[in-house]
């Protein structure tokens, strides 16, 4: 199986079988054929199927130790020649997984059938853990499971690629037709295969458009769906995050599950690890977010900045701004183009929103020198967040007198009067420095602290108006447009020399895309869709867009790892 696109561990892929190929997620009996279970005690030879299951022993989920041990011993004696699919019985005793994995690894199977799936789905932690271990260990293996269609979005999101539809005939026999609200509401007309096909097409569409997580959050028909997603979010956030691309479009946070999305975890980590305040800051301001994005285009932030300009004049080039929001917590002004999200606004914040935002703000405040004054122009729950952050960080925060909202005449007057107490003057050099910093911080977000300085050092130049072209010593390093960046091979070389980040190492002459089989090493920080430098003998020979995560590139044996955009 070759991966075309990721959203979380979920993959849009293609499976090639000689002259025939099909896309995943897929359905047994519709997209490809799969042999029946092949018993070790009555083994059958490979037949005329796309995937032939090797002889196996049907171990139940609660099978005792002594039976499992005896079965594994027998499975090592099987002749696996001609079989391209392995039956993996999901067991509560997960310590035996490694033995099954050794068999899969040794015989290079193309597919794994996950047995006991319908019991496993009720064991939240085991379900997520087994899928994670399979997916991380065997990136090119197609995972097949026997589940009802209302589990398809969640199962695909966590790493399953195909579904066995043969057991769905039982619902037809019972006269139950699936609906959007099954298993609580059923139709009187049997429709199992049609409904399965509709759902799988919907899942593919969601993957294509980067909206699979959104679909998952709208498919919560059972407690099992909700429980499994919660376990995945809370106990395996790194598993979800490393396969999740940086969002290019607006992310919609529509439920309590939304605030646990991997994009939120990543944002918090990057604020802590990749954001550094500008060096010339003499005053820090805290503002609330706005419904309109980017914030600077909103009426409220236009009024805030007008008040700041009125109070400080040239000193605005020495002021830094942090925006408080849910669920991202803290958005530095330079990163407002990157915070593409929308959320239900009611004025009511849950503890699950307030505490993480306050903790993130507290840690962010610690990045600023202790003598830098902090002024907060906030209302409602934002005040609670700032006060808690002040307690956690030990930093004093001055609050303006807000009445009738932060944009009322009285509130804006209070903001102006509060800021006039600070004597701050900026120079032309400060304005130029902050202009450069607005660009640098975005490159830091994508590649790490120091990337912006590598792309745009003090002797760098910025040309253009809408699309900014960045040059160092006459050579272009990249472009910048409203938070969207590109990097040239020369710019990527400077980042590689400075940070050793976002690289993929090869040992051949680069002529086209980089396939996974040709990847020697890759930076584990790479996520799908990231800009990466292709390195040979410590020289960047090309720049491209990652298809796989860095870890996945090294493990995978098939498919494109990097789509090359520019070569040296």
Curated annotation (Swiss-Prot):
This is Archaeosine synthase subunit alpha. One of its GO terms (molecular function) is RNA binding. It comes from Thermococcus kodakarensis (strain ATCC BAA-918 / JCM 12380 / KOD1). Forms a robust complex with the archaeosine synthase beta subunit RaSEA, likely an alpha(2)beta(2) heterotetrameric structure. Formation of this complex highly increases lysine transfer activity. It catalyses: 7-cyano-7-carbaguanosine(15) in tRNA + L-lysine = 7-N-[(5S)-5-amino-5-carboxypentyl]formamidino-7-deazaguanosine(15) in tRNA. The gene is arcS. Functions in the biosynthesis of archaeosine, a modified nucleoside present in the dihydrouridine loop (D-loop) of archaeal tRNAs. Catalyzes the addition of L-lysine to the cyano group of 7-cyano-7-deazaguanine (preQ0)-modified tRNAs at position 15, to generate q0kN15-tRNA, a q0N lysine adduct identified as 7-N-[(5S)-5-amino-5-carboxypentyl]formamidino-7-deazaguanosine. GO terms for cellular component: cytoplasm. Belongs to the archaeosine synthase type 1 family.
């Amino acid at each position: 199986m070759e991966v075309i696109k990721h959203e979380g561990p979920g993959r849009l892929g293609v499976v090639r079988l000689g002259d025939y190929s099909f896309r995943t997620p897929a359905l047994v009996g519709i997209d490809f054929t799969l042999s029946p279970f092949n018993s070790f005690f009555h083994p059958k030879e490979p037949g005329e199927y796309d995937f032939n299951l090797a002889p196996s022993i049907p171990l139940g989920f609660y099978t005792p130790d002594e039976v499992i041990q005896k079965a594994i011993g027998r499975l090592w004696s099987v002749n696996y020649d001609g079989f391209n699919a392995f039956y993996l019985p999901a067991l509560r005793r997960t310590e035996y997984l490694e033995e099954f994995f050794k068999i899969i690894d040794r015989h290079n199977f193309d597919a794994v059938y996950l047995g006991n799936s319908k019991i496993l789905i009720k064991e939240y932690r085991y379900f997520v853990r087994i899928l994670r271990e399979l997916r991380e260990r065997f990136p090119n293996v197609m995972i097949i499971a026997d589940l009802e269609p209302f589990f398809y979005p969640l199962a695909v999101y966590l790493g399953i690629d195909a579904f066995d539809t043969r057991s769905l005939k039982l619902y037809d026999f019972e006269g139950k037709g699936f609906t959007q609200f099954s298993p609580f509401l059923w139709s009187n007309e049997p429709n199992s295969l049609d409904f399965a096909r509709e759902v799988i097409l919907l899942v593919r569409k969601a993957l294509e458009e980067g909206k699979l997580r959104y679909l998952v959050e709208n498919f919560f028909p059972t407690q099992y769906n909700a429980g499994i997603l919660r376990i995945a979010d809370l106990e395996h956030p790194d598993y979800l995050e490393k396969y999740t691309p940086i969002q290019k479009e607006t992310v919609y946070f529509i439920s309590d599950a939304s605030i646990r999305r991997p994009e939120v975890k990543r944002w918090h980590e990057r604020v802590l690890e990749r954001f550094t305040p500008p060096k010339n800051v003499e005053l820090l301001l805290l503002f609330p977010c706005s419904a309109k994005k980017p914030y600077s285009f909103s009426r409220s932030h236009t009024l805030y900045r007008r008040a700041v300009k009125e109070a400080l004049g040239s000193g605005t080039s020495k002021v830094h701004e942090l925006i408080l929001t849910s669920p991202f917590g803290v958005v530095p002004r330079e990163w407002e183009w990157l915070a593409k999200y929308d959320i239900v606004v009611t004025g009511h914040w849950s503890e699950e929103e307030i505490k993480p935002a306050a903790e993130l703000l507290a840690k962010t405040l610690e990045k600023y020198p202790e003598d830098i004054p902090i002024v907060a122009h906030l209302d409602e729950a934002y005040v609670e967040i700032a006060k808690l952050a002040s307690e956690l960080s030990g930093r004093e925060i001055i609050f303006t007198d807000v009445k009738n909202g932060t944009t009322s005449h009285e509130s804006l007057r209070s903001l102006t009067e509060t800021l006039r107490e600070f004597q701050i003057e900026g120079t032309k050099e400060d304005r130029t420095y902050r202009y450069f910093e607005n660009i640098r911080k975005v490159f830091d977000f994508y590649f790490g602290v120091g990337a912006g300085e590598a792309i745009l050092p003090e002797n760098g130049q910025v040309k253009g108006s809408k699309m900014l072209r960045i040059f160092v010593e006459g050579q272009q390093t990249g472009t910048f447009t409203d938070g969207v960046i590109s990097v040239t091979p020369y710019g990527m070389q400077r980042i590689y020399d400075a940070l050793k980040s976002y690289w993929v190492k090869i040992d051949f002459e680069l002529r086209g895309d980089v396939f996974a089989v040709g990847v020697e090493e890759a930076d584990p920080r790479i996520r799908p869709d990231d800009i990466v430098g292709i390195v040979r003998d410590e020289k960047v020979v090309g720049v491209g867009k990652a298809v796989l995560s860095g870890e996945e590139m090294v493990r995978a044996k098939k498919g494109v790892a990097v789509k090359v955009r520019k070569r040296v």
